[in-house]
UniProtKB/Swiss-Prot annotation:
<feature type="short sequence motif" description="Involved in PIP2 interaction">
    <location>
        <begin position="81"/>
        <end position="97"/>
    </location>
</feature>
<dbReference type="GO" id="GO:0005938">
    <property type="term" value="C:cell cortex"/>
</dbReference>
<keyword id="KW-0963">Cytoplasm</keyword>
<dbReference type="InterPro" id="IPR036140">
    <property type="entry name" value="PFN_sf"/>
</dbReference>
<dbReference type="GO" id="GO:0005856">
    <property type="term" value="C:cytoskeleton"/>
</dbReference>
<keyword id="KW-0597">Phosphoprotein</keyword>
<keyword id="KW-1015">Disulfide bond</keyword>
<keyword id="KW-0020">Allergen</keyword>
<keyword id="KW-0009">Actin-binding</keyword>
<dbReference type="InterPro" id="IPR005455">
    <property type="entry name" value="PFN_euk"/>
</dbReference>
<comment type="function">
    <text>Binds to actin and affects the structure of the cytoskeleton. At high concentrations, profilin prevents the polymerization of actin, whereas it enhances it at low concentrations.</text>
</comment>
<dbReference type="InterPro" id="IPR048278">
    <property type="entry name" value="PFN"/>
</dbReference>
<dbReference type="GO" id="GO:0003785">
    <property type="term" value="F:actin monomer binding"/>
</dbReference>
<keyword id="KW-0206">Cytoskeleton</keyword>
<comment type="subunit">
    <text>Occurs in many kinds of cells as a complex with monomeric actin in a 1:1 ratio.</text>
</comment>
<dbReference type="InterPro" id="IPR027310">
    <property type="entry name" value="Profilin_CS"/>
</dbReference>
<comment type="similarity">
    <text>Belongs to the profilin family.</text>
</comment>
């Protein structure tokens, strides 16, 4: 299965009539492996800050997390494994695997829990596959 298929079928899937606004699978250095059409372009320093937060949980909390210059308030995640952010009525979930970052960005009517479920389920599967 191609990386694009994972994005199209597993991240941009229909959940109770809703879907993520955008999603992607990136390498740890920020290289895009696959992405949905509307996925924003991360800046290198944004990826570096996200990776630092995985290594040093809490690093982003005081300043917030920036994604394509949009600022997200960092909310409870799983230290070293999942970073979650909130911005207005939407948010972001980033799951780290051995080689990749699985990213989902949502807005209402999708809920944070639905976004978390979709992103973390694929991330857990990739971890099980050694990726």
């Amino acid at each position: 299965m191609s990386w694009q298929t994972y994005v199209d079928e597993h991240l941009m899937c229909d959940i109770e009539g809703h879907q993520l606004g955008s999603a992607a699978i990136l390498g740890h250095a920020g290289t895009v492996w696959a992405q949905s059409t509307a996925f924003p372009q991360f800046k290198p320093e944004e990826i570096a800050a996200i990776m630092k937060d995985f290594d040093e949980p809490g690093h982003l909390a005081p300043t917030g997390m920036f994604v394509a210059t949009a600022k997200y308030m960092v909310i409870a995640g799983e230290p070293g494994a999942v970073i979650r952010g909130k911005k207005g009525s939407g948010g972001i979930t980033i799951k780290k695997t051995g080689q990749a970052l699985v990213v989902g960005i949502y807005d209402e009517p999708m809920t944070p829990g639905q976004c978390n479920m979709v992103v973390e389920r694929l991330g857990d599967y990739l971890l099980e596959q050694g990726l």
